[in-house]
């Protein structure tokens, strides 16, 4: 309860004792970390999940995704997904993970979800489900464009997980958590960068262009 975790732009993952502000352990995750670290307890042991983008690696590289023992920094598993830099009008957009991963619950308690940017060609992006125990990719669902916004979850009366995520072209997707099947998608905004706020069966999310959307999932 007294440990905190953070990552920086050089890929350093640090565990800090919050009682005395001294470092406990360190892990090198290779590249710039924008995605927020998430933590989940398993049998009394905290585990942290982290991933990087492709920035200092150059035009192409690997998104390094890792699960670490929160007490000592030992690697439970680490997987790599090839990603690239996307160049548009003399601007570049780094690939990899930007969104905060979503820890699955209910019928998806064995999974963790996130999006990866530029993990293909021409600005491709996919929504991924990873097995918490091994890091194995259970499925990946192609989006119309890559995503930076974090996925959020909804549960029905059967405790089945459904996920909403927005991409950088302004599309919102409703995805079945267990299978990755896209139930619904529609273009609402211009570019979703902010993460949705969920209240009950309703989400609120802002896009570029001074627009805020309220969407009911029913």
Task: State where each predicted segment sits.
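Extracytoplasmic/lumenal domain signature
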Residues: 1-218
């Amino acid at each position: 309860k007294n440990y905190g975790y953070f990552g920086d732009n050089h890929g350093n993952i640090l565990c800090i004792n919050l009682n005395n502000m001294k470092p406990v352990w360190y892990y090198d995750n290779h590249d710039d970390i924008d995605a927020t670290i998430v933590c989940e307890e398993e049998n009394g042991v905290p585990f942290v999940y982290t991933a990087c983008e492709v920035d200092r690696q150059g035009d192409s590289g690997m998104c390094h995704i890792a699960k670490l023992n929160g007490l000592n920094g030992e690697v439970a598993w680490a997987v790599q997904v090839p990603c690239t830099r996307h160049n548009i009008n003399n601007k570049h957009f780094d690939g990899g993970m930007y969104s905060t991963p979503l820890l699955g619950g209910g019928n998806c308690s064995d999974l963790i979800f996130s999006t990866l940017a530029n993990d293909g060609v021409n600005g491709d992006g996919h929504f991924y489900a990873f097995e918490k125990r091994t890091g194995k990719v259970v499925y990946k669902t192609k989006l119309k464009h890559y995503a930076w916004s974090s996925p959020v979850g909804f549960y029905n009366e059967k405790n089945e997980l459904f996920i909403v995520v927005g991409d950088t072209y302004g599309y919102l997707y409703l995805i079945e958590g267990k299978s990755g099947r896209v139930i619904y998608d529609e273009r609402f905004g211009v570019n979703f960068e902010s993460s949705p706020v969920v209240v009950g069966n309703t989400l609120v999310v802002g896009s570029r262009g001074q627009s805020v959307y309220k969407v009911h999932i029913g």
